[in-house]
């Protein structure tokens, strides 16, 4: 298995393309100059395209991924109705979802042969919209609205329109600020990192109709932490055994173990990392975690070790200015 790591640096308007080997070493393949401040990125389900959100001219860009080394070639673009904060796709590669924090909306762009061709739907009134997350069955889009302390739930229609479910939302605790999410591989649980109080909520998917319930909330900060809380990103290993979340003020990655059924998290430890970690990701083998330091202008590679999933640093690498996003592609 070959793996490529992509890092987005908006301040220098660059994407760095790296080859990741089996020992956790990165080798630079390409530096792409992007026409705008590049932030959120996602790889298409068929692993042939990288979709990128840019500002201040709000667009989604599509880059073809070379099958031999992961290098990028620009392919297409499509306008967006707001500044892109988060980008994702459905599991069949038919639609791109873009959440916009500043505009307070989530948009759906149709894909044709892997390329963005037209805006299909826009849902407004999502104050502080921070991500858009399709359920493993490809039926429901979960949209955390940070400023409204809620997660909005939409059914994805065959033509890409979003229809509010009943109930249309679930509330988080006051002052939480739901931000990013991941789903457990067993499809029965989801985990949401809350930006404002640096906690993680465990949500149970109760039935196929989209009903969900919060079954656990866990503080992700050390007991003696007294500064402003500012959580950012969350990811789970492919086997569902280990979960990680980061806080930017503390420049810390919190390590969680996940119970066998996915319902219970336990804090295993804390890993100091690059300054102001805005984004990170886990490779497809579940062996390495790559974190980006928005203030250090570096990325760091960690090996995931032992039954607790603790992190051991393998190396750090200079990237562009203000790196914010990391994605990994395997082929």
Curated annotation (Swiss-Prot):
EC number from the UniProt entry: 3.1.1.31
GO biological process: glucose metabolic process; pentose-phosphate shunt, oxidative branch
Reactions catalysed: 6-phospho-D-glucono-1,5-lactone + H2O = 6-phospho-D-gluconate + H(+)
GO molecular function: 6-phosphogluconolactonase activity
UniProt KW keywords: Carbohydrate metabolism, Glucose metabolism, Hydrolase
Signal sequence extent: none
InterPro entries per record: 6-phosphogluconolactonase_YbhE, Cycloisomerase_2, Lactonase_7-beta_prop, N2O_reductase_N, WD40/YVTN_repeat-like_dom_sf
Keyword Hydrolase: yes
Pathway entry: Carbohydrate degradation; pentose phosphate pathway; D-ribulose 5-phosphate from D-glucose 6-phosphate (oxidative stage): step 2/3
NCBIfam families (alphabetical): PRK11028.1 (NF008258)
Described purpose of this protein according to its UniProt entry: Catalyzes the hydrolysis of 6-phosphogluconolactone to 6-phosphogluconate.
HAMAP family, per the entry: 6P_gluconolactonase
Protein name (record): 6-phosphogluconolactonase
